[in-house]
From Swiss-Prot:
Organism: Prochlorococcus marinus (strain NATL2A)
Swiss-Prot/TrEMBL cofactor(s): a divalent metal cation
Name by which UniProt lists this protein: 5'-nucleotidase SurE
Cofactor: binding comment: Binds 1 divalent metal cation per subunit.
Major site of localization recorded for this protein: cytoplasm
């Protein structure tokens, strides 16, 4: 296939190993790669935008090499993609990749994900986009995730990419030889036991750390193929999960069940 113009972003920041692996993987296949991502950790910022302070962008080519153009930006992941598409890029990209995230983006956690938000900006602009995550905060080998991401992207881009389709890829933290097959999955509904740790600073002011953990994963959110496993259950089986999602959040339940409000 002819080389693609690929924009890559993330929410872990310009120094993260995941984004460097993804950019290098794409460039090694002959694609024209541009990285525009936060200049620091911006995890769990969701689709937030910077509206009350300037966004600064500094060149960061030296962090990547291999002909990859890169910027580190002071804004959120969504800011980065907006800035890239409207100011930094000479041409519209053929593909947007977001990641490789250091940690999972499964189920309804995607609403908090800066990784998914960056990819969603591409989807909203009509650009084929994929969010990529390794489902562990400790796993540091991103080479297979980079390879699989590009395999999927190249295969999908040669087909008729449906309008409003965003692909969310999660890869289990295990060696390639131990993995099961890649399958289509549904989004789980993740329920958490929220915890806040209360502390007092040296000046006597109270502050909090948010903690908590997932205590329940319901099989699926919304409508969809009943035979598909959930993304959480697929990762638990040490198999990659590929979930099709879209920006349209319109409720698809029975309209007769809506409250009588109008």
């Amino acid at each position: 296939m002819k080389p693609l113009k690929i924009l890559i972003s993330n929410d872990d920041g310009v120094f993260a190993e995941g984004i460097r692996t993804l950019a290098t993987s794409a460039a090694s296949r002959g694609h024209k790669v541009t990285v525009v991502c936060p200049d620091q950790e911006r995890s769990a910022t969701g689709h937030g935008l910077t509206l009350h302070s300037p966004i600064r962008a500094e060149k960061a080519d030296e962090l990547f090499g291999g002909g990859i153009k890169a910027w580190g930006c002071s804004g959120t992941p969504a800011d980065c993609v907006k800035l890239a598409l409207n100011e930094l890029l000479d041409q519209k990209p053929d593909l947007i990749l977001s990641g490789i995230n250091h940690g999972p983006n499964l189920g309804t956690d995607i609403f908090c994900s800066g990784t998914v938000a960056a990819a969603l900006e591409g989807t909203l602009d009509g650009i084929p986009s994929i969010a990529v995550s390794v489902a562990s905060f400790q796993w540091k080998n991103f080479s297979f995730a980079g390879k699989l991401s590009l395999d999927i992207a190249e295969k999908a881009i040669q087909q008729n990419w449906p309008k409003n389709l965003l692909l969310n890829l999660n890869i289990p933290p295990c060696e390639e030889k131990e993995m099961g097959d890649l399958v289509w999955t549904r989004l789980s509904i993740r329920q958490y036991e929220e915890q806040f740790i209360r502390r007092v600073d040296p000046r006597g002011n109270t502050y909090f750390w948010m903690a908590g953990e997932a205590v329940k994963d319901l099989q699926s959110a919304g409508e969809g193929p009943k035979g598909w496993p959930s993304d959480v259950s697929q990762i638990a089986l040490c198999s990659p999960s590929l979930t099709p999602i879209q920006p349209d959040l319109f409720w698809r339940g029975n309209l007769d069940d809506l409250p009588n409000l109008i």
